[in-house]
Amino acid sequence: LHSTSRRQRQMCIRDRDSIKEDASAIWFLGDLFDYWYEYKYVVPKGHVRFLGKLAELADRGIEIHIFIGNHDIWMFDYLPKEIGAIIHRDTLTVDLLGKRFFLGHGDEVDFRSKAFRLIRAIFRNKFCQWLYAGIHPRWTFGFALGWSLNSRKSGLEKQEAKKYQGEDAEYMVVFAKEYLKTHPDINFFIFGHRHIMLDLMLSRTSRILIAGDWMQFFSYIVWDGENLYMDQFLEETDGQSYPLSLIHISE
């Protein structure tokens, strides 16, 4: 959300506002922010209206679930304390309205790159986080935001980030197929991270969905207890947008 225009942020808020009457839970699948780090007394500026809308939804009894992504790993206790959000740091298997879901950002099941796994382990290491927290935010925020935006732009420009790779090469699909062999009770695998929209049958009782993003597709997933489907929030924009994958659970 750091690099968005005011109009785009308002669009995001209107989308959350449109579901407040019938949603029972909202699940954000990671990378809610381009960069987020919580010091003991300092958090990133901005996001007031968006976080205010989430607080309003939480006050109405709607559960707010947030998976950490690879861009906002360093969420700690600020959002749980301020808006009652539930933070998930790894994949989660959960029953929702009668079906079994396997949820995650998606980078958790990417076992292809040793370098990526090493960086991820360093970023999640508590001692490394403690060392990083000792650096003044004047230096860390500018550097990290620049790195994050660079990483996102270069990633979206790569062919890998633009196109579906096929069942045998798309690593989330490969993971889901293997996992399903030992956990046949999973009805839906749902991930973000890849910036593609995908809805694929894995078996007669199981599907995998990759939720797209809010930079290109303005996409989200709805589960009402009977039907699970992907939809898009359609409104004219002025070009750039922001990554935001979510699941909206309604009753």
Predicted regions and their residues:
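Single conserved hydrophobic/aromatic residue that forms the stacking wall/gate
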Residues: 1-9, 13, 247-251
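Core catalytic region of metal-dependent phosphoesterases/phosphodiesterases
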Residues: 10, 14-96
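Conserved beta-sheet core of the metallophosphoesterase superfamily
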Residues: 82-89, 102, 107, 112-126, ...
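Structural motif
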Residues: 96-97, 223
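Active-site-proximal loop/helix segment associated with metal-binding centers of metalloenzymes
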Residues: 106-171
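C-terminal or late-domain output modules
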Residues: 227-237, 242-246
